[in-house]
Every structure is written in C-alpha cells, then in structure tokens.
Amino acid sequence: MKMMRGSRLFAGGATRLPCVCATMFACWWLIPLGLPDTSHAQVTPPITSSGLNTHISKPSGNSLQYDITAGTRAGTNLFHSFGDFSVPTNNIANFLNDSGLATSNILGRVTGGNPSNIFGTLQTTGFGGANLFLMNPAGIVFGPNAALNVGGSVSFTTADYLRLTDGARFNAIAGPQDAAISSAPVAAFGFLGSNPAAIAVQGRQLAVAEGQGISLVGGNLTVQGGTLADTT
C-alpha cells in the first residue's frame, strides 16, 4: 500500500475524491469505493456506548444535547467507544471534559456497523485545543445542517484502525488490544480491505478554528454544494 501526505480543501457542486487528509497526518492510499445514495439518510439510532467507560447523558426536557463524558485515558489521549454515533438535526453531541485533565487527542470509534449521520453539531467543551478523531468503518455522512465546534483539528475516517507513533493500534472493533491503548499521537489511518466506506458532505461548510485542519480519510469523498475550510 502507498502512503500519501497532503493538504487539500474542496468546494463546488459535486466533488468526488478518493481520499483527503491534513498535513499533520498520514493515510493509506486506497482503491476507491463508489458512494452509496445518501439523499434519504436517517439519523437513527443516535448515540450509544460500547465500552471504554464511555458515558452518554441523553437529552432531557427541552435539551437537545448529548453529553459524552468519562472514557479511558492514556496520557493525554482520551478514548471513547460508541455502538452507534449519529447526531440528529438541531442536536448537539458534546464531548465534555468532566475530569478537567489535560487532553491532546480525543479518539472515538463506532462499533455497531451503522453509518454515522452527522446532521447536527459536534462539539468539545473544556478540552481547549484538543484534536478530535471519529472512526466508523461503516461510513460517515454530513447533512446540510452539520456543524463543528471543536478547539483543535478534526479527523473523520472509515479506517479499520488508527496507528499511533509507537506502533500501537486503536482498532474499530473492541478486543483484548483495548487493554494496551497508548498515549502516543496518531501517525496513520489503517485499512484491512480494499473497499473502504465512503464519506459524504451534503451542502454545508464544515469549518474549524483558524490554524486547525479537517481530515476526511476513507473511500470516495463526495462534497455536494459545500466546502471544507478553516476560519481564516
């Protein structure tokens, strides 16, 4: 497999590309997979936990915010595991630093086999400039009202694992290796097959803070009437 490094932002009507990644990361270059029809994507079920001490507080009353707390720490890395991870329109998925500990990277995986439909807001609270990674091998769709409110860079991937600089892996499937999660930074996105799931951005500008980056790493990337940008 070939390693690719680069930084590219895309805009326009309908753009289809095999892989996008920010300069701070590396990704495995892959054979593209055709994008499934996402025009009628549903946002059910929303967010559930699948281990690693991930806690999710469901909205109550008039609230539309899911607070994601706890998780499993290794140094300044914070790991979360979700059975499903989708954000309905007008809802907020809020990664909340309930411990107050210094955090460099928030790494989340989705294990349930359903795509992540991000139609609301992804947010981090109390993490400063921590980077956010979300890995779902089943696919990721950003709807027309999707938004990011994250202090650091963000990476969305349909990879099967994240490889860290010390050689450790954070796998999309739970297993005994979870006992050896690492404090090292993310070095690469790893795929076990030649047909990774696609990522779609539908009619929305996904923006991050000035000086930060957006990485979309997986199969075909389709940007329909939207842009990827920072706020410079």
Indicate where each model-derived feature is located.
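N-terminal secretory signal peptides that target proteins for export/translocation
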Residues: 1-17
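Cysteine-centered motifs
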Residues: 19-21, 27
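Solvent-exposed adhesion/ligand-recognition segments of exported proteins
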Residues: 4-5, 26-232
